[in-house]
Amino acid sequence: ARELDIEKTFECGQCFRWNADENGVYRGTAFGYPAQVWTEDGEVYLCSDAPEKMWREYFDLDRDYAGISAGFHGGEYLDSCIAYGQGIRILRQEPWEALCSFIISQCNNISRIKGIVERLCESFGEPVEFEGAVYYAFPSAQRIAALEPGALDVLRCGYRAPYIMSAAQAVADGSLDLEA
């Protein structure tokens, strides 16, 4: 994949479900599909049961980021920012997961956000087995909205729990359209 640095993309703070093992293989899920992603000799490899089209869209691979950044001219500082961000792709994440992760991220650090999101998925997401490991899909808004009050306490997300529940209820009842 051109212009894709998986470490920069997964570690820049835009997503919280990808974790690298000791060999640099990232394991995670997107749209309920588990995957393993790694770089070897400058090439990115992906192992998943999901259709290639889904991953192309998820990693936004059909967008020419080099062409976009070539259009910016702002001096030395902007050039250094563009160079630093080279290889980062804007992930086309599932809207509900992105919203929920955003709520969790308020006044939080990446390590804690990852922990809360992981507990959310393990507690309320559907298990999916892949390559001998169990992954958890991100729970749907409908699943979260149907929970009893206090059920999110297990996440240890503090004051964010009612906001997660409120957002889930709005998505589930259609008053918040994430595709609008």
What kind of region is each of these model predictions?
Residues 1-180:
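HhH-family (HhH-GPD) DNA N-glycosylase catalytic core used in base-excision repair
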